């Protein structure tokens, strides 16, 4: 080390060399010093830098974070004390928080109020609009001003008066539709000659079995009119029944088509538009059809996924409350060990393991039940179980393996199936002839063509704090040798602290810097104090290469969430059971195979695209991609249901939303 300050001439040469090697470094050192108020506002002699030298007494260019800043105004003894590295924790730095779940709000119920009608005074005058602002049809006037007999007019008058006395409630959107429908069709749909028609009874019978589809029958059932009522009371009861049943049919159409729970009210991570429905047209279709039940069934999903889940729900046994076996949450039992919890785990397997597994292993487990020494046949049986439930087959009985039994008793399985059926109602009911399906809870991706799974691979999805969104789109582009535009949340929350601490971080990792207008800038031109405080002003891009976070390709379906599928240089994560590790995008285990599939090519056909430079290829026909979350999902080859951990706590959100929906709807039972 030089013992005395070097000359300004040498320093100029040295500083220029450092700036050439890393243009960010000198400016950052200055910015950090300013941020930490290491220097007072008084004018002081300019600092000089003491640099290490090599054996030939030649200056060595290095990271200025290692250089000592010397202030000539200080004594030599106080130099080292004054030049401590800035405390980054003291910098006032903006952060971008993760979205939080919403406080779920079910659609509230409102009275179905028809306008008052006075035919005697007005001879066909009614209010100009409904309480919901819907214009009234002129059909009333047409009917009443026709050449119909006085008896017909009296019947119409009586019928309309019945409707104005209806005492029923429905969701606000449905109430308005019901009123508008009866305005245009002023007659009762579900009764004739004072009796409820057979079609209405068939509909109610269908509704009574909707628990087979994971729905709540009481949401749709309507009490039959009292048989002991006669005359005007009977007619009013029939009118009330008619309007109420119509509102429940519309509720059913909505729930079956779009889901009982409104997905986008659960959390910002749900982005699932509600399907548009011509309720008036559907109601007419039901009223006129000779096959009403077939129409009602058609509103539910009819995919193999849905029907397999429905079958599994029906086949679940009644909940058993006598297998109250408890194992400590952090229990770990390795092959060769002796453990008092081993008999409990064996008993859990016998009680709760899937029948497909027990059909082959039940005899062995029964013979070894009570055994505390973990070896031999029992280890093999546990490995087979781990394979069966898609866990790492290492024979280690840990929280992940235990959780497949403790967290999946009959009640839990039933609710997971019901949740999965509900989530299928949120999605398009026809996925298409070819599509990509990501199940975030399973950490898996599949490419499906003509109902056949052509590809099935592991994926890494967003962490619980940076969840992958639940939505669907269409794949349109594959980019080879991609650059990476770093999301602002990553820049602000993760990269800025590294940049402020390590002046060579950007250059070493092949990052480029851009100002707010998109113009390339050097790090030395950035006001890092301002960027750190407001979280804006720059963008960062990583150039293509082996260390690029996106690996050698990305598969794009442009969306507002900046989510896409991509390769990764970090392959080790695929060996883990819990793979919710990314910032939200989906890392593919076999990216080349997936890219070839969506492009309609063979994997070998892609080799020229990796030769040199960033290059994008558009899909001739966009491929639907569904980024979903199912904690119960069928294997269509075997019909077996696989159950997965609720890594994002979305089942818990569903439970809360379901409870609130039950509370609102039960008010009108």
State each model region's role.
Residues 154, 162-229:
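Flexible, low-complexity segments enriched for small/polar residues
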Residues 11-23:
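Bacterial N-terminal signal peptides
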Residues 2-13:
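Bacterial N-terminal signal peptides that target proteins for export
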Residues 208-274:
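Mature extracellular/secreted ectodomains of secretory-pathway proteins
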Residues 25-28, 229, 451, 455:
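Conserved, well-structured beta-alpha core segment at the onset of a catalytic domain
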Residues 2, 34, 38, 45, ...:
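Well-ordered beta-sheet/strand-loop patches within structured domains
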Residues 21-41:
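Signal peptide processing junction and immediate N-terminal pro/mature segment
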Residues 200-203, 226-232, 236, 379-386:
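Amphipathic alpha-helical segments that form the core helices of the histone-fold
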């Amino acid at each position: 080390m030089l013992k005395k300050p070097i000359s300004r001439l040498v320093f100029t040469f040295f500083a220029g060399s450092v700036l050439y090697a890393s243009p960010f470094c000198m400016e950052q050192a200055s910015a950090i010093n300013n941020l930490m108020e290491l220097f007072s506002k008084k004018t002081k002699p300019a600092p000089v830098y003491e640099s290490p030298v090599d054996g030939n007494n030649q200056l060595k260019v290095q990271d200025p974070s290692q250089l000592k800043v010397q202030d000539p105004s200080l004594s030599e003894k106080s130099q080292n004390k004054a030049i401590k590295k800035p405390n980054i924790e003291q910098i006032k730095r903006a952060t971008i928080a993760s979205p939080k779940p919403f406080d779920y709000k079910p659609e509230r119920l409102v009275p179905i109020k028809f306008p008052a009608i006075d035919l005697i005074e007005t001879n066909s005058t009614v209010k100009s609009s409904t309480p919901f602002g819907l214009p009234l049809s002129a059909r009333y006037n047409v009917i009443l001003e026709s050449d119909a007999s006085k008896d017909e007019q009296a019947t119409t008058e009586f019928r309309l008066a019945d409707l104005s006395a209806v005492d029923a409630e429905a969701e606000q959107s449905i109430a308005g539709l019901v009123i508008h429908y009866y305005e245009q069709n002023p007659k009762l749909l579900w009764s004739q000659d004072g009796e409820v028609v057979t079609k209405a009874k068939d509909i109610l019978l269908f509704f009574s079995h909707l628990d087979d589809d994971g729905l709540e029958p009481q949401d749709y059932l309507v009490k039959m009119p009292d048989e002991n009522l006669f005359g005007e009371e009977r007619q009013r009861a029939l009118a009330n029944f008619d309007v109420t049943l119509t509102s429940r049919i519309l509720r059913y159409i909505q729930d079956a088509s779009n889901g009982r729970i409104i997905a986008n009210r659960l959390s910002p991570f749900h982005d699932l538009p509600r399907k548009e429905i011509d309720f008036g047209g559907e109601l007419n279709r039901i009223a006129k059809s000779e096959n009403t039940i077939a129409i009602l069934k058609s509103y539910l999903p009819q995919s193999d996924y849905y029907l397999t889940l429905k079958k599994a729900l029906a086949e679940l046994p009644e909940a058993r409350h006598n297998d109250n076996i408890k194992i400590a949450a952090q229990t770990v039992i390795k092959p060769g060990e002796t453990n008092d919890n081993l008999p409990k785990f064996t008993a859990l397997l016998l009680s709760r393991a899937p029948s497909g597994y027990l059909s082959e292993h039940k005899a062995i487990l029964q013979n070894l039940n009570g055994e505390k020494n973990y070896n031999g046949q029992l280890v093999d049986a546990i490995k087979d179980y781990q394979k069966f439930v898609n866990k790492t087959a290492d024979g280690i009985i840990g929280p992940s393996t235990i959780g497949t039994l403790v967290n999946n008793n009959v009640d839990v399985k039933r609710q997971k199936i019901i949740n999965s059926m509900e989530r299928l109602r949120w999605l398009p009911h026809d996925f298409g002839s070819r599509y990509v399906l990501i199940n975030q809870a399973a950490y898996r991706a599949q490419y499906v063509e003509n109902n056949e799974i052509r590809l099935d691979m592991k994926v890494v999805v967003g962490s619980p704090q940076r969840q992958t969104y639940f939505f669907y789109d269409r794949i349109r582009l594959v980019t080879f040798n991609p650059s990476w535009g770093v999301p602002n949340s990553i820049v602000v929350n993760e990269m800025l602290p590294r940049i402020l601490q390590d002046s060579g971080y950007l250059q070493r990792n092949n990052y480029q810097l851009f100002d707010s207008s998109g113009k390339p800038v050097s790090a030395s031109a950035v006001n890092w104090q301002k960027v750190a405080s407001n979280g804006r002003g720059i963008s960062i891009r990583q150039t293509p290469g082996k260390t690029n976070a996106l690996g050698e390709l990305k598969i794009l379906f442009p969306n507002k969430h900046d989510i896409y599928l991509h390769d990764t240089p970090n392959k080790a994560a695929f060996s883990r059971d819990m793979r919710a590790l990314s910032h939200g995008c989906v890392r593919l285990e076999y990216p080349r195979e997936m890219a070839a599939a969506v492009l309609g090519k063979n994997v070998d056909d892609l080799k020229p695209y990796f030769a040199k430079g960033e290059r994008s290829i558009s899909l001739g026909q966009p491929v639907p991609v569904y980024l979903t979350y199912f904690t119960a999902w069928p294997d269509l080859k075997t019909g077996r249901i696989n159950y997965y951990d609720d890594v994002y706590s979305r089942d818990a959100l569903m439970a809360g939303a379901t409870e609130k929906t039950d509370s609102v709807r039960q008010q009108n039972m």
